[in-house]
Amino acid sequence: MKNQNLLWAISGGRCEYEGCNTPLYMDILTKKKYNKAYIAHIVADSLDGPRGDPERSEKLANEISNLMLLCDPHHTLIDKDVANHPEDRLVEMKRKHEER
């Protein structure tokens, strides 16, 4: 839970996917508050997941450096289109978003 709260804080409660920045805590039209966020793993938390790694998956599972806050479409995209979303690209997206 501690890392989840930290992730929300450092992401500003917005999707970390490049070019998105959608608020994940409220509807932008109605301003109604809710949680639309997905916490995604850069390196999968299991070997058979997207970008899974036999040596690092378990170790990185809950590391803040391995977690991204994403909207539903981008959470689905990074896991279905792994070839275009390698670890280094996701790490760079996260870095750029969190440095803003």
Residue locations for each model-derived region?
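A boundary/linker detector
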Residues: 1-12, 24
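Short metal-coordination and nucleic-acid-contact micro-motifs, chiefly zinc-binding Cys/His arrays
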Residues: 8-16, 63-67
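Short cysteine-rich clusters marking metal-coordination/redox-active sites
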Residues: 15-20, 71
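Histidine-centered nuclease catalytic patch
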Residues: 22-67, 77-95
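Charge-rich interaction segments
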Residues: 99-100
